[in-house]
A protein has these predicted regions:
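Select subsegments of transmembrane alpha-helices in polytopic membrane proteins
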Residues: 1-2, 113-122, 209
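Mid-bilayer segments of alpha-helical transmembrane spans in multi-pass integral membrane proteins
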Residues: 77-87, 115-127
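Hydrophobic alpha-helical membrane segments of integral membrane proteins
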Residues: 82, 92-96, 108-112, 121, ...
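Transmembrane alpha-helix interface/packing and boundary motifs in multi-pass membrane proteins
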Residues: 76-85, 237-258
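Predominantly cytoplasmic-facing regulatory/coupling regions of multi-pass membrane proteins
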Residues: 1-74, 132, 136-246, 274-306
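Membrane-interface alpha-helices at helix entry/exit sites of multi-pass transporters
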Residues: 67-71, 85-90, 100-116, 270-281
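Juxtamembrane transmembrane-helix termini in multi-pass membrane transport proteins
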Residues: 54-57, 98, 107-108
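Re-entrant/interfacial helical elements at transmembrane boundaries that shape
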Residues: 89-98, 251-267
Length: 306
């Protein structure tokens, strides 16, 4: 309820600062060809995300038919709309998968790996975008960007060694505590993915493509609304906007994510009305992309399935 209230409060603040009627008119006036292109990119995004999920399910060795694996992903994505953004869909997916396989720790670990690779690729893309936007002639920026990319990569790699880090830095007296036992089992399950470097490489590549597709979606929406900002700037700022949408401080990314995108487009001269229209369309498309999961969910409920 707190996050729902925060989303409403942030939307109310945006409404007090920006003409919402003008924003609605701007959104409705979007070029149809650009809108259809953005919809197509959302479909590509979902297909790539589902492919990544199926790779994880197969590697985890879960006794789950392809149809059920697809069902878990789509329904989990839909149920995540009613939970805090970012972690909501992950939590729902882990819960549904655990119920279907009776492998709770492995389910949570698989979802955590999926999310961590997504965040890593997002951070890496932001660094690349920063370099492209500010120009390659700045040697200091290039060095700092390479250092930042290396730091992000090392930090992401440490996640896969969480089991070893726990054993090294957690006091032995905590070993008998129930929460530590659960944390250790989860860390071991995540650490097991170290044995599959080719899988991690494929998943990381898919994650990078997904993030580029999402940035391209925002770019296409902006072009369709009539403001022209270089794609290199989208590569620099949109990963931050996507992260704001994913943070568990709002429902579905409404309010906070929109406000961040509006603020990030101001330095390049985009009017607030247009940037709010773009961010609203972007968030709405994300919500609407979960409709297949909604249909599967209600169909299962009508049949008495879980």
């Amino acid at each position: 309820w707190f996050r729902a209230g925060l989303s409403v409060a942030l939307l109310g603040y945006l409404a007090s600062q920006i003409d919402m009627a003008e924003t609605a008119r701007a959104a409705l006036a979007i070029n149809p060809a650009h809108l259809l292109t953005a919809v197509a990119l959302v479909v590509v995004d979902r297909v790539l995300m589902l492919s990544r999920w199926l790779l994880l399910v197969r590697r985890a060795g879960m006794a789950l038919p392809l149809k059920s694996a697809v069902w878990v992903y789509l329904v989990g994505s839909y149920l995540g709309n009613f939970l805090p953004s970012g972690i909501g869909a992950d939590a729902a997916r882990a819960f549904v998968l655990a119920r279907r396989t009776d492998r709770g720790i492995d389910s949570v670990a698989m979802v955590a790996i999926d999310r961590y690779l997504g965040l890593y690729s997002l951070a890496l893309l932001a660094v690349v975008g920063l370099v492209l936007w500010t120009g390659q002639d700045n040697a200091d920026l290039q060095r700092w960007s390479i250092a930042l990319a290396a730091l992000v990569t090392v930090g992401a790699g440490a996640f896969l060694w969480a089991d070893r880090l726990l054993s090294l830095f957690i006091p032995a007296a905590w070993a008998t505590r129930p929460w530590f036992n659960r944390a250790s089992r989860l860390a071991e399950a995540m650490g097991s993915y170290r044995r599959y470097p080719s899988l991690l490489g494929a998943l990381t590549a898919l994650s990078l493509v997904v993030q580029i597709v999402r940035v391209a979606q925002a770019y296409v929406l902006g072009e369709g609304l009539g403001f022209h900002v270089p794609f290199s700037y989208y590569l620099a700022f949109m990963p931050i906007g996507i992260l704001a949408i994913l943070l568990p401080v709002s429902i579905g990314g409404f309010g906070f994510g929109q406000g961040v995108i509006v603020a990030l487009l101001r330095p390049v001269g985009v009017p607030d009305v247009q940037s709010l229209a773009m961010s609203t369309l972007y968030v709405l498309m994300g919500v609407l992309s979960t409709l297949p999961g909604a249909l599967l969910h209600f169909r299962s409920r009508s049949r008495g399935l879980s």
